Amino acid sequence: MNKRAMLGAIGLAFGLMAWPFGASAKGKSMVWNEQWKTPSFVSGSLLGRCSQELVYRYLDQEKNTFQLGGQARERLSLIGNKLDELGHTVMRFEQAIAASLCMGAVLVAHVNDGELSSLSGTLIPNLDKRTLKTEAAISIQQAEMIAKQDVADRVTKERPAAEEGKPTRLVIYPDEETPRLAYEVNVRFLTPVPGNWIYMIDAADGKVLNKWNQMDEAKPGGAQPVAGTSTVGVGRGVLGDQKYINTTYSSYYGYYYLQDNTRGSGIFTYDGRNRTVLPGSLWADGDNQFFASYDAAAVDAHYYAGVVYDYYKNVHGRLSYDGSNAAIRSTVHYGRGYNNAFWNGSQMVYGDGDGQTFLPFSGGIDVVGHELTHAVTDYTAGLVYQNESGAINEAMSDIFGTLVEFYANRNPDWEIGEDIYTPGVAGDALRSMSDPAKYGDPDHYSKRYTGTQDNGGVHTNSGIINKAAYLLSQGGVHYGVSVTGIGRDKMGKIFYRALVYYLTPTSNFSQLRAACVQAAADLYGSTSQEVNSVKQAFNAVGVY
């Protein structure tokens, strides 16, 4: 089996370069979007006495730079406003015109001590000056039929059993140089193979402008929670190690369930019974001892979900993947010999593997951490799973999956999936953060994959960012560039802050660099070794 899931981008931000501010922000730092000729990352002391209105005022003041084509308050809608862990106010805005949101055009504003300190994200310039149609010529139903037919013809080769996905909506899609009115259609299905496809359908003529699979992969006698008493059971995982797990005893049913009531809104583990219907049945046992071989995948999925919850809570102050203590649900024994695991947008799903290429996927703690980090990304930056933004999405999951493994101190290393991949081959893994080239992945931007396979190389080009993260943590010399390591903890803090507070759906590698530099400055000071090490690490992999 090919180790990379064969999953192609919205090019809001292509090559970036440093650019000076206008007179009103003299001497500040800016990263420039070469495609749209507008800023994608701005930092420094911008304006004081900040509020939503101040952000609008600054953008209007810099109208020749941002080229919004109208008043900022008419083009940007506030969609989020919160305080972060450092006491900074973080506001998220979406660009819209004629009530249609602009796909991926999100702006994040940071306020520190009452002063606007940074803007990140890329906006589409001069929409009011373009011949942009704002009324659709085809209906929602027609757009949905076109997307479903394309799935049947080109993806599954048969009509899939579609599930309810995100509602179809009209958006402004930045199709190369000409933004277009388009329908965003979500086609979600589990058979014949799982998929969570996003389609951009031209609202004028029904043409498929773009499509990608947003399925984030690694490569009581029912589904409802039960009322009962919290207990602790014991069992054996996929690799034969014993674990204590939080369960719930229902006196009504007389069974112990894999339902952990001690963390957030609960952790629930289900038995898929080798079918493809989710979530399956809440796992039940008669004596609270889970030592049967069939139990092993469930023991690990349940236990490791708790470890991931604890990592994000204790290290980053994050309560579950959504930040609001959402329940974590996992299904094991999905399908027969299914060689993958995925986050489907609402829960975790683990295949059993075929016993040769893979063991049950829940047996790898870094795999569980990887997949649940996709959920964190969904609720924060929302990185589009295609091209560079998709590779960042994958790299974030590799980074935090690895950090979870170190946090739990379960034979930690810088390999991905080594515990469950090719059980008959020692020393093998899906990917390596320390040496991406070991498994054929690029370790420098000059070696990046530029084709369309794997959604534009999301599982391949992630190696570039993985190497940067490894160098930032451990240090070393790479392509002649010396990097001073700052340790895993600080590296994780920097990448987490970049993910949650600076990245936007279409961020590319250069924007990630700028976000990590700013995150390090926020945490450790603008003249700190940490900031210098971030720059060194990205220099070493050719990302500027």
Swiss-Prot record:
Keyword terms: Calcium, Hydrolase, Metal-binding, Metalloprotease, Protease, Secreted, Signal, Zinc, Zymogen
Q: What would be the name of the gene that encodes this protein?
A: npr
Leader sequence segment: 1-25
Give the location in the cell. Secreted
Q: Which residues bind Ca(2+) 1?
A: D285, D287, Q289
User: What is an example of a Pfam family matching this protein?
Assistant: Peptidase_M4_C
Q: Which InterPro entries match?
A: PepSY, Peptidase_M4, Peptidase_M4/M1_CTD_sf, Peptidase_M4_C_domain, Peptidase_M4_domain, Zinc_Metalloprotease_M4
> What does the entry's cofactor note say about binding and number?
Binds 4 Ca(2+) ions per subunit. Binds 1 zinc ion per subunit.
- Cofactor list: Ca(2+); Zn(2+)
Q: Which reaction is catalysed here?
A: Similar, but not identical, to that of thermolysin
- At which positions is Zn(2+) bound? H370, H374, E394
Q: What class of enzyme is it?
A: hydrolase
Name the record gives this protein: Bacillolysin
